[in-house]
Amino acid sequence: MKTFACTFFLSFVLVFSIYADTAYPVIVVAQDGSGDFITIQDAINSVRDFTPVPRVIHIKKGIYYEKVEIPSWKCDITLKGDGPEETLIYYDDYASLRRMGTFRTYTLQIRGNRVTLENLTVENRAGRVGQAVALHVEGDCVAVRNCRLLGNQDTLFTGNENSRQYYDRCYIEGTTDYIFGPATCWFDHCILHSLSLIHISE
């Protein structure tokens, strides 16, 4: 079983490496108006549904206060920042706010397949007020590279048991259950930082 799992994930990583090194059309998001769009969501919405050509959305340096959604019909998209310290996406919803519940508190939700995040930070700034998700992933074949995922309780939700996810050189922090969900995930050279005295189970 372990051999099968390793073979599967090595194949998964190889495919994404080839995918990442290929040149695709680029959409630019810049808060100063120098790009194609000012908001990340508008850039995502501009991508053709079930696009036959993968698209790269370059999010320039800035702090973006947005609740971002990549729906299931938006696939083959890469969100690429200028670096985890330079490109920051944040929101501040939490479970008891308007009784929204845990699974609607995300800052960024990914439901599309073959989505990649690179060189950026996703943060939920609600604070220690209970469940508050930063990144919510349900899509299949999702890769997250060189990113920071910041929050407190429930920072990263790896939703959907049929989802396969790859996290490479990421920094993930939180308190209670800050990585949770039924997906199959591989964490490669990631740093997990517990903000309180809790145990991490394997």
What are these regions (language model features)?
Residues D21-L197, S201:
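Sequence-level preference for short, compositionally simple segments enriched
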